[in-house]
């Protein structure tokens, strides 16, 4: 029995999904109704699933822009504010030594969001501005991750995520409303972001216990829900130039 308990199954689960006490509780004593350990297992599993999914979540958006050779319908201000919010989460989480499963997707989404920023600028004819933006962003990121940056500054950056998320999503919602369609906005990306932010409310409470982190995801879920609702509402709407081509 001891050999089974110390087998490869345990070596995979214990460092990744469960503390040893919970592994013993669930898989040695077979107590599958132990709520605290089940919460840990669910939170870690969801967290790792979100992190894995984040590797792909914005790729449909990137491919849609590349395929159309256009970023029509995407608000640059909204994308940049989302980049600010994601960067704040990454820096705050690293500074506070939060487990990677509780914030890892923010890192991958940051890389994909900066790519979208560059594509929007490129297809607007501002490629040089995009390169300058990337250089400035990298410099600022290194400065914020430096030990010389006060914790108060990092905390303030994370607190600014709420207005950044709200304003950014409202700008995108306003763009959609003004255009009467969602342009090159990817429905897959929008719905994945909505689902991920909802799941993150639970995992951030469970894994970090940080009300600031949880609050950001609550607000993010509401805003992502608004954009998702617009995607459904404008599902059959097409940009004017497409109507002209069909006529």
From Swiss-Prot:
Lipid bilayer topology: Multi-pass membrane protein
Main function: Required for normal utilization of mannose-dolichol phosphate (Dol-P-Man) in the synthesis of N-linked and O-linked oligosaccharides and GPI anchors.
GO BP: oligosaccharide biosynthetic process
Organism expressing this protein natively: Cricetulus griseus (Chinese hamster)
Family designation: Belongs to the MPDU1 (TC 2.A.43.3) family.
Cellular location(s): Membrane
Name of the protein described by the UniProt record: Mannose-P-dolichol utilization defect 1 protein
UniProt-listed InterPro entries: MannP-dilichol_defect-1, PQ-loop_rpt
Signal peptide: none
Sorted UniProt keywords: Acetylation, Membrane, Repeat, Transmembrane, Transmembrane helix, Transport
Domain PQ-loop, residue spans: 39-105, 159-216
Membrane-crossing segments per the record: 46-66, 74-94, 103-123, 128-145, 151-171, 185-205, 213-233
A Pfam family: PQ-loop
Residues with PTM N-acetylalanine: 2
Entry GO terms, CC: membrane
């Amino acid at each position: 029995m001891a050999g089974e308990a110390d087998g490869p199954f345990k070596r995979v689960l214990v460092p990744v999904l469960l503390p040893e006490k919970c592994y013993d509780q669930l898989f040695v004593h077979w107590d599958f109704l132990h709520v605290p350990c089940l919460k840990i297992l669910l939170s870690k599993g969801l967290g790792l699933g979100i992190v894995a999914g984040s590797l792909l979540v914005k790729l449909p958006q990137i491919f849609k822009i590349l395929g159309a050779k256009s970023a029509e319908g995407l608000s640059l201000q909204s994308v940049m504010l989302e980049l600010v919010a994601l960067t704040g989460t990454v820096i705050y989480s690293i500074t506070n030594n939060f487990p990677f499963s509780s914030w890892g997707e923010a890192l991958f989404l940051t890389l994909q969001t900066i790519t979208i920023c560059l594509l929007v600028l490129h297809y607007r004819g501002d490629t040089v501005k995009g390169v300058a933006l990337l250089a400035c962003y990298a410099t600022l990121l290194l400065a914020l991750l430096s030990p010389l940056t006060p914790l108060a500054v990092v905390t303030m950056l994370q607190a600014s995520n709420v207005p950044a998320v709200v304003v950014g999503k409202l700008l995108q919602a306003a763009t959609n409303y003004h255009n009467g369609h969602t342009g090159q906005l990817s429905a897959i990306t929008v719905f994945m972001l909505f689902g991920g932010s909802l799941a993150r409310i639970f995992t951030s409470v469970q894994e970090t216990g940080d009300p600031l982190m949880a609050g950001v995801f609550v607000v993010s879920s509401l805003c992502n829900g608004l954009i998702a609702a617009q995607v459904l509402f404008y599902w059959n709407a097409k940009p004017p130039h497409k109507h002209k081509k069909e006529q």
